[in-house]
From Swiss-Prot:
Assigned protein family: Belongs to the peptidase C1 family.
PROSITE patterns: THIOL_PROTEASE_ASN (PS00640), THIOL_PROTEASE_CYS (PS00139), THIOL_PROTEASE_HIS (PS00639)
Sorted UniProt keywords: Disulfide bond, Hydrolase, Lysosome, Protease, Signal, Thiol protease, Zymogen
Positions of disulphide bridges: C115-C161, C152-C193
UniProt keyword Hydrolase, yes or no: yes
Chief location bin: other
GO molecular function per UniProt: cysteine-type endopeptidase activity
EC number: 3.4.22.-
Protein name as annotated: Cysteine proteinase 1
Nuclease among keywords: no
One Pfam assignment: Peptidase_C1
Length: 315
């Protein structure tokens, strides 16, 4: 038994060195010992989960050497009150499955880094997708500026790298438009708003999907990408690798939502109907940046507060 445990730790210790190299991490000797211990702790969580669940966890991802508390400090979606906005009932028959990636209407996965700017990435991913669907363009080259929204939406209620809401991003874009990434590149840190950038795209408004209504959310996704918010606080989400994700620990009430992402489709995974959700933590997390979240029971709140831009246009 001792030999097995020793081999287990040595094995994951070797993996820790690989993880450090793959993720370009640089630790002092003391910090490296601490991170290795956390990595080994997470490796035990992975092994236990993967014996019990059909969805898989991994220590390959960017948060493998973080405690769950450290990881949670990165989740900075701000909820200050019940949001208002038009709820549009589409009342259409949605197809059984939709995946906008297969239609070339989803831009590449982005990485928000250590900046609490998920609210910009979720909302802008939905906008980019809707532009491609409604106005055309190249999904590989279309890249709107998250930096523009991080630095310039404070007067709309956001707080830079310390969190915000996608609805505030849409309010800003309605009035001022949004620049291209090449004109206002992402830094992952707080700075002042530049007034010299040219807007590249704009929206007329945005709609909310009826809360906790999975039929209406499917209808909305069948017409384009949708900005959604979730409770991403559990260690299972932190270490997610693949499969149909369900989580008994996560919550789905409005004030528990702490991370903004983007739904790009839905379909069946491992025999379970799932939302296809795009994250903003790079391609090293999850299924090359995506997670399949089980629809039944509103897993982690995907259907709690969805919204999407309308009247999208290039300028």
């Amino acid at each position: 038994m001792f030999t097995f445990i020793l081999m287990f730790y040595i094995g994951y210790g070797i993996d820790f060195n690989t993880w450090v190299a793959n993720n370009n991490k640089h630790f002092t000797a003391v910090e490296s010992l601490r991170r290795r211990a956390i990595f080994n702790m997470n490796a035990r969580i992975v092994a236990e989960n993967n014996r019990k669940e059909t969805f898989k966890l991994s220590v390959d991802g960017p948060f493998a050497a973080m405690t769950n508390e450290e990881y949670n400090s990165l989740l900075k979606l701000k909820r200050s009150g019940e949001e208002k906005g038009e709820v549009r009932y589409l009342n259409i028959q949605a197809p059984k499955a939709v995946d906008w990636r297969k239609k070339g209407k989803v831009t590449p996965i982005r990485d928000q880094g250590n900046c609490g700017s998920c609210y910009t990435f979720g909302s802008i991913a939905a906008l980019e997708g809707r532009l491609l669907i409604e106005k055309g363009g190249d999904s590989e080259t279309l890249d709107l500026s998250e930096e523009h929204m991080v630095q310039c939406t404070r007067e709309d209620g956001n707080n830079g790298c310390n969190g915000g809401l996608g609805s505030n991003v849409y309010n800003y874009i309605m009035e001022n438009g949004i620049a291209k990434e090449s004109d206002y590149p992402y830094t992952g840190s707080d700075s002042t708003c530049r007034s010299d950038v040219k807007a590249f795209a704009k929206i007329k408004s945005y709609n909310r999907v009826a809360r906790n209504n999975e039929v209406e959310l499917k209808a909305a996704i069948s017409q384009g990408l949708v900005d959604v918010s979730i409770d991403a606080s559990s260690v299972q989400f932190q270490l997610y690798k693949s499969g149909a994700y369900t989580d008994k620990q996560c919550k789905n009430n409005y004030f528990a939502l702490n991370h903004e992402v983007c739904a790009v489709g839905y379909g069946v995974v491992d025999g379970k109907e799932c939302w296809i959700v795009r994250n903003s933590w790079g391609t090293g997390w999850g299924e090359k940046g995506y997670i399949n979240m089980v629809i039944e029971g509103n897993t982690c709140g995907v259907a709690t507060d969805p919204l999407y831009p309308t009247g999208v246009e290039y300028l």
